[in-house]
């Protein structure tokens, strides 16, 4: 080697050697970039299960034995609304339930159930059943009162058994809820309640009660607590907010009831970049000019994208970008091929090489809707002139994506503005089988295509996005912590042109917006360090596995045995050990998250965990 070095040092064309070396290095970089694209394609193929092996959640839950009795009253509006949420909560937790509407059916004997959930704020219609519930708990039963109770004669009979030492007939304001850090993932802080009202029963609890959440004020009114009674246990939810954004609070409360609670989760975090790559965003560049003195094009190339890559590197994020071909509003179906391709290839290839993924957003930004859809004054869009026009536009988008990124599998579709008509969805399924995932909205919005985390009966993976933008408002914060505890998932999207829209925070400037996004990522991965960073199709594979999974639990004093039906290759399961601590494990890996909450990665269809 020393001789070779000496030879090179004496080589009279060594300057030429340096130049050739530079060109060789550039060639290697270009080859690596291209090979990175091929590598990504292989990864995505492994993410999805084969279509003919997928068991949907609807199919999976059909044969689950009922272990929980739900009592509700169809004459109470809040009871009906609560059941709408709890029906999905129990489905996703793979808990078999029997529903007893006291207005329409007899209340069955309690002896065949492990738990009872009462979805009633007014217990008067239950009459003496309230006493029976107390007696059942004393003998070892477990009961959750999920709605804020109204003080009356029957509640007065049972309130001491709930751990209550003092109560009033009125309610108090819940504008902030503080969550104990040992109770819920992301706790150890308070969360602002949007549109707060007097939703909590004004009570005090004694030393026998264990409080997990309370109002973040001087009164510290208990909002979630448990109280042992006899051989059993009561859990009380007293915060009064029962909606999709708080499902995780109820899942966490329900998990307090039994000695060991288990339920499947997704374990995944995805960050979407909508409209990326795309033509140069149009809009008001006032604040970009104010802060950087740059054009919109130069800002995105030299400031925004390097900063986004830095955030990804710091937090381990793998972006999923969804392509938009152009921003024109032509809905005739007379498609025009995009000629300015350099920008697409530059950003798209960098995203792929970073470990990310590309998907589809739109030929333009007009949602897939026909003339039967009326946007009225809600959205500034046109409808497509015909089914054939929609099809031609999607065909051109897919052609363009394949041409720009050959060898890359693009399987994810994000509807423009999260709007997708029934006809548009049917067209995607029928005409474009390469699209296997639709990613839209978790919550109801302006004509939004609203989803659950599930596989639809036609095989499409529904992957809703929970939060958006760099300005994470109070409602989104509440939803984010809820979903960490419901599905152990984060799905977020933002647009590059957020910086051009005052409604999305443009006036704040990119430095402040970047700081807020960084703060959200810090909170997320500090709260859940074992949360997997995934691309969209990888999360879709997780949704397929999670939806199919059914867990058979057997608990003794010394061990927990889990039998997993519809197990493919791996599964993630949340375990709360209210009694004992885990020891040796067979068939999986256990990670402590917080308090008595653990994440199980099951590697086999049978898992045994020692209880100490």
Go through each PLM region and give its residues:
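Helical hinge/lid and interdomain linker segments adjacent to catalytic or ligand-binding clefts
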Residues: 75-151
